[in-house]
C-alpha cells in the first residue's frame, strides 16, 4: 500500500477495510482479519491495527464476539428512491 504522509495510517487502513465491508468483500457475519493479520497485510503496528478494528465497530461496520473475533455487520438497506 502506498501511504499518504499527511493522513494517519490508521485512517488509510480504515478506509480500505471499511470499503471491503461495504462492497461485500467481507459479507455480513464474516470474520474480519485479526489485528495480527492486518499488521502483516499493511505493515502496521498492532496498536494501529486494533485502532482500525475499534473504529470499524464504532462506525457500525463490525461487531465483536468476545473470545472469537470481529465480524462484518449487516449494512442497512438503502431507501427506495
Cite the ranges covered by each PLM segment.
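Extreme N-terminal segment that seeds HTH/winged-HTH DNA-binding domains in transcriptional regulators
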Residues: 1-54, 58-63, 68, 74-81
Amino acid at each position: 500500500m502506498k501511504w499518504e504522509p499527511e493522513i494517519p495510517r490508521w485512517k488509510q487502513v480504515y478506509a480500505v477495510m471499511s470499503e471491503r465491508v461495504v462492497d461485500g468483500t467481507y459479507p455480513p457475519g464474516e470474520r474480519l482479519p485479526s489485528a495480527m493479520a492486518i499488521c502483516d497485510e499493511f505493515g502496521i503496528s498492532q496498536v494501529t491495527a486494533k485502532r482500525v478494528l475499534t473504529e470499524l465497530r464504532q462506525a457500525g461496520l463490525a461487531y465483536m464476539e468476545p473470545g472469537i473475533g470481529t465480524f462484518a455487520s449487516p449494512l442497512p438497506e438503502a431507501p427506495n428512491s
